[in-house]
């Protein structure tokens, strides 16, 4: 479950609130790290990951694979949905995206090692129970791995890097064995810089021929798509956790390294990088080469090629191997992760807290709703005058559960 050789074992009326599904409302999911979270702009879908075992001397354990948690970004409420079908094994370090409310899941690490299986779950389904479907894709797949990144462009999912097994077939790119993995495993693993494309219309794998200077092999890096550019920042390669920034042109497949002006974030892995506008990326948290958890946040301005430190109220809440999703309201929603050195397994402080970063000005509707809620006693008799969709939002917010956690 670690980012390299230290094996931790183990984003009108609001859209449908999933009332039609078999669901349970609970305060919040269990604490976890190494999970996936994706967003349709209004809901954040959380799956997988692992947590510490409360019994001293026992290993960490994976979270139940059937559980899909849905966080309403407007109301701050959680729902748990039990899924069925070709349910993926419980895993950490998988890679996931949400496209048109369809969840795609690839790779990860489970109790028997790494995998390269591909799954999808359609959250638009009319069925009362959401169904996972394992897709048998055409072509040569990526090797079995975890801690990789993904870009979404047109009808393509483009995967980059990761940590896992040597490819069984000949692939384009570099694979570097982790020498220490020979000591504690019969299936040694390593880092790679492979780029693989999955066409979501044909479900066929392919590899592009890239040009330019490719980034070094890496894992636990962070990827973000803006326009036709796939950005990648940081990650771990051997003993170094890096702070280099690159982008891949997703039309021409040319790599470019960016050398930003001024100060830059320190090297890290297990961080998050989230597109928040057509010109900005938002970076939060991570883990340094010196094994220090980070709580700093930065915005990267694409047009100016510069990093700007972002002030926020969570400086005492470092996070690594967390997730981050953008909402339609100009917020970045961070969930879970570890607050200390994840590699000291019996002391790992996994979290189930939601951290909300406002990276864009709030809309007038949002400000008005917050004012109505703030002065609820004074304005309650006038609520019936609100448009139906606004009244729905107000009522949901009053039922909101606390987003704070462990």
From Swiss-Prot:
Provide a Gene Ontology MF annotation, just one: ubiquitin-like ligase-substrate adaptor activity
Q: Which cysteines are joined by disulfide bonds?
A: none
Q: Which UniProt keywords apply?
A: Kelch repeat, Nucleus, Repeat, Ubl conjugation, Ubl conjugation pathway
Gene3D superfamilies for this protein? Kelch-type beta propeller (2.120.10.80)
Q: Name one Pfam family in it.
A: Kelch_KLHDC2_KLHL20_DRC7
Keyword Ubl conjugation in annotation: yes
PTM comment text: Autoubiquitinated by the CRL2(KLHDC2) E3 ligase complex.
Start-end of each Kelch repeat: 31-85, 92-136, 148-207, 221-259, 271-311, 322-359
What subcellular locations does the record give? Nucleus
Biological process, per Gene Ontology: proteasome-mediated ubiquitin-dependent protein catabolic process; protein ubiquitination; ubiquitin-dependent protein catabolic process via the C-end degron rule pathway
Role played: Substrate-recognition component of a Cul2-RING (CRL2) E3 ubiquitin-protein ligase complex of the DesCEND (destruction via C-end degrons) pathway, which recognizes a C-degron located at the extreme C terminus of target proteins, leading to their ubiquitination and degradation. The C-degron recognized by the DesCEND pathway is usually a motif of less than ten residues and can be present in full-length proteins, truncated proteins or proteolytically cleaved forms.
Question: What PANTHER family does the database record attribute to this sequence?
Answer: KELCH DOMAIN-CONTAINING PROTEIN, KELCH DOMAIN-CONTAINING PROTEIN 2
Q: What is this protein called?
A: Kelch domain-containing protein 2
What gene is this protein a product of? Klhdc2
């Amino acid at each position: 479950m670690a980012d390299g050789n230290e094996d931790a074992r183990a984003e009108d009326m609001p859209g449908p609130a999933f009332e039609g599904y078999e669901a349970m409302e609970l305060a919040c999911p269990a604490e976890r790290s190494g999970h996936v979270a994706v967003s349709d702009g209004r809901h954040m879908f959380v799956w997988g990951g692992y947590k510490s075992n409360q019994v001293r001397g026992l290993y960490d354990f994976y979270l139940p694979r059937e559980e899909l948690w849905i966080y309403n970004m407007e109301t701050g409420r959680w729902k748990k949905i039990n899924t069925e079908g070709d349910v993926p094994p419980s895993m950490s370090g998988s890679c996931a995206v949400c496209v048109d409310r369809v969840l795609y899941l690839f790779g990860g690490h489970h109790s028997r090692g790494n995998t390269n299986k591909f799954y999808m779950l359609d959250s638009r389904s009319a069925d009362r129970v959401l169904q996972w479907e394992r897709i048998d894709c055409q072509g040569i797949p990526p090797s079995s791995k975890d801690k990789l990144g993904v870009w979404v462009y047109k009808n393509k999912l483009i995967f980059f890097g990761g940590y896992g097994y040597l490819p069984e077939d000949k692939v384009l790119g570099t694979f570097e064995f982790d020498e220490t993995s020979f000591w504690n495993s019969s299936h040694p693993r390593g880092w790679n810089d492979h780029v693989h494309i999955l066409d979501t219309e044909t479900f066929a794998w392919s590899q592009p021929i890239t040009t330019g200077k490719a980034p070094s092999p890496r894992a636990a890096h962070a990827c973000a798509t803006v326009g036709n550019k796939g950005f990648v920042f940081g990650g771990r390669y051997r003993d170094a956790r890096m702070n280099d920034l690159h982008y891949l042109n997703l039309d021409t497949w040319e790599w470019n390294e960016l050398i930003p002006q001024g100060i830059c974030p320190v090297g890290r892995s297990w961080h998050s990088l989230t597109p928040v506008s057509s010109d900005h990326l938002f970076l939060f948290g991570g883990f340094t080469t010196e094994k220090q958890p980070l709580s700093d946040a930065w915005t990267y301005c694409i047009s100016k090629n510069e990093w700007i430190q972002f002030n926020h109220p969570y400086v005492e809440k470092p996070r690594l191997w967390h997730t981050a999703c953008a909402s339609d309201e100009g917020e970045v929603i961070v969930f879970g992760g570890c607050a200390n050195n994840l590699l000291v397994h019996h002391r790992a402080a996994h979290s189930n807290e939601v951290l909300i970063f406002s990276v864009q000005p709030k809309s007038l509707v949002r400000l008005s709703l917050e004012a109505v809620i703030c002065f609820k006693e004074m304005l309650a008799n006038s609520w019936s005058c609100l448009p139906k969709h606004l009244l729905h939002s107000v009522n949901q917010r009053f039922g909101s559960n606390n987003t704070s956690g462990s």
